[in-house]
Design a protein with these regions (language model features):
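Extracytosolic ligand-binding ectodomains
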Residues: 2-26, 31-421
Length: 421
């Protein structure tokens, strides 16, 4: 008799088909106890969480990301849910504070979530990763880029932290290229101005390692300060050729307004995510190391679904991808539990399997039911996760020219070495 247990090309066994075979052979009465522990009774919801800044300076990013994650939940439920169970979303407000996030995480965990999207801010993800690993919950961040998160969230032989946004190690290489390259800024001496948190300090440290230019000043700043003139004065005290600026949309304005009000003049190179909307005239000639904004089919489908968010905030589409990967991983594993999701999330993110994308969770379920490999093609990118459960992504060197953003050079992900699965 031909076995119903199938082995995929990634070496994993299709547990969903194994369960079906067990029920057919043994009968529901014999196998019912085991079945309910894995698949539920068809009514109990699978709960995923979200930790996001829904108030404060990052409120727009947090609320847009929440809306995208809600859309992912709706798409999964429209396809029949995870393992025939509806998905529910438990959302808590981190307020962009690690202390608040830890408190709200405990509340969310008490609701019975098996994994969560978040944090957005690197400080929050750094605080939550060890807790999630200890509790056996899968955490997938759509926006935390600190290099210190590579290898975070490990418990035994499992990694419980992943992200759908690449590490700042990649961004630092592109910022350094824009500052050093004779085709761009061609600076000999650079001042680094960075937001005073794990994201800012981590990217600044990586810039030190990748710059050929000497660093004239390191200036950390508090985005909630009342006066930013001292930040600009310190940055220009030793007459640098350029400024490398590490910040985030919504937290950069104070420093840049202070620069505009000063008599200093030099090109700036921005970290990603700050060249959007109406650009001030003094941005002319500024550069950015930006994530490549390739409009994938998944991106176009999702932004059409989220047409009320125009323009959509950075990282929102990454939030959609985070939820979809966890849902697909649970479906692949045949079990809606954190350890099972951690074991399967890389397998559904890349490789040579059959592709599915935004709004196609029904296709993923059908393929997995048939014992096939799947490969999620996300809204943000292909999202092929490496062994540290983070993607490599292409970047673009951009420059503000005549009030618009000009793309100067595409840096393919192969430039950074390595690969996803």
């Amino acid at each position: 008799m031909k076995s119903d247990i199938s082995t995929r090309s990634d070496g994993t066994t299709s547990r969903r088909r194994f369960l079906a075979a067990g029920v057919g052979t043994l009968g529901l009465g014999t196998f019912g106890g085991c079945l309910s522990s894995v698949r539920g009774d068809g009514r109990d919801p699978v709960k995923f969480g979200m930790v996001a800044p829904l108030s404060g300076s990052l409120e727009r990013i947090g609320t847009h990301c929440k809306r995208a994650v809600e859309q992912a939940v709706a798409d999964v439920n429209d396809a029949g849910g995870v393992l025939d169970r509806p998905v529910e979303l438990v959302v808590v407000d981190s307020g962009a504070s690690a202390e608040t996030a830890v408190s709200e995480y405990e509340s969310m965990r008490g609701e019975g979530v098996v994994g969560f999207v978040g944090g957005l801010v690197s400080d929050v993800s750094i605080a939550l990763a060890p807790k999630a690993a200890e509790d056996g919950l899968m955490e997938v961040s759509p926006a935390s880029t600190s290099p210190s998160l590579t290898g975070a969230g490990v418990n035994g032989d499992r990694t419980f932290f992943g992200r759908t946004i690449p590490s700042d190690l990649l961004q630092s290489v592109v910022m350094a290229k824009a500052l050093d390259d004779p085709r761009y800024v061609d600076a000999d001496r650079v001042s680094l101005v960075y937001i005073d948190n794990a994201y800012g300090s981590g990217l600044a440290e990586a810039l030190h390692e990748n710059l050929s230019a000497s660093v004239a000043a390191d200036v950390a700043y508090d985005p909630s300060a009342d006066d930013f003139a001292p930040v600009v004065e310190e940055a220009f005290a030793d007459d640098p050729d350029a400024v490398g600026f590490v910040s985030a949309s919504g937290q950069e304005k104070g420093v840049l307004d202070a620069y505009d009000a000063s008599d200093y003049e030099a090109p700036w190179v921005f970290s990603t995510g700050m060249l959007s909307g109406d650009l001030p005239s003094y941005y002319e000639g500024f550069y950015s190391a930006s994530l490549s904004s390739v409009r994938t089919n998944g991106y176009l489908t999702l932004t059409k679904k989220l047409s009320e968010l125009d323009p959509i905030a950075p990282y929102a589409v990454n939030g959609y991808d985070a939820l979809m990967l966890m849902a697909a991983a649970a479906e692949h594993a045949g079990e809606a539990a954190g350890p099972a999701i951690a074991d399967s999330i890389r397998a559904v993110s890349g490789g040579t399997g059959h592709t599915f994308s935004v709004g196609e969770f029904d296709r993923a379920r059908a393929l997995l039911d048939a014992g096939r490999d799947v490969n999620y093609q996300g809204a943000a990118s292909g999202v092929d996760l490496n062994a540290d459960l983070e993607p490599l992504s292409p970047y673009v060197v951009e420059r503000v020219t005549d009030g618009g953003v000009e793309q100067l050079e595409l840096i393919q992900k192969g430039y950074f070495g390595g690969d996803g699965q």
